UniProtKB/Swiss-Prot annotation:
Family according to the record: Belongs to the major facilitator superfamily. Allantoate permease family.
Record-linked InterPro entries: MFS_trans_sf (IPR036259)
Keyword NAD part of the UniProt annotation: no
Membrane topology: Multi-pass membrane protein
Name recorded for this polypeptide: Putative uncharacterized transporter YOL163W
Organism of origin: Saccharomyces cerevisiae (strain ATCC 204508 / S288c)
Domain of life: Eukaryota
GO MF entry, a single one: transmembrane transporter activity
Length: 169
């Protein structure tokens, strides 16, 4: 989220076709898996029957956000000429700064799993040990294949590059 907001912010400096295509390609690269990853992350906390209502909240919120940002865009387009920038440049800059703030906040607030909610600056996690066991058991009863989720490992830059360049995907 942070990477795509930085690239999107750079869109306010686009000057031609090549910069447009470069920005859009990088946006697609960084933003492409966001929804799928968000659904996967939410599935760590909710059973399949609970997940559908949470995802409906996500999609409704997305639609409402698009309505609100359209109204904001109308006002921002009237900023044309300020600082030597066009209205569309201001729009990219302002909207993406909000995305950057949300991305940085998400980095600090989102946790890897139900049992890993403690942060260095917080002595308590989100749940008590009993609540963690209840949630984990509920998730495993709903989908036993999630029992091997704990074998995750960090991704190196080499592994990332192999994934990007694998043309069999």
């Amino acid at each position: 989220m942070i990477a795509w907001s930085l690239v999107a912010t750079l869109q306010c400096k686009m000057t031609g076709k090549s910069s447009f295509y470069t920005c859009r390609a990088l946006m697609g690269l960084f933003e492409g898996g966001f929804v799928a990853d968000l659904v996967l992350w939410m599935s760590y906390f909710y059973s399949s029957s609970e997940l559908s209502i949470r995802l409906s909240f996500f999609w409704v919120t997305l639609s409402l956000t698009q309505i609100i940002t359209s109204i904001v865009a109308f006002g921002v387009f009237h900023m044309r000429g300020i600082g030597g920038m066009a209205g569309w440049q201001w729009l990219f800059l302002i909207e993406r700064i909000f995305t950057l703030v949300i991305g940085i906040s998400a980095y600090f607030l989102m946790v890897p799993s139900v049992v890993q909610t403690k942060k260095p600056w917080s002595k308590k996690g989100w749940f008590t040990e009993r609540e963690e066991k209840i949630i984990v058991n509920k998730i495993l009863r709903d989908d036993p294949t999630k029992g091997d989720m704990n074998n995750r490992q960090g991704m190196s830059l080499k592994m990332l590059w192999q994934g990007i360049t694998d043309y069999y995907i």
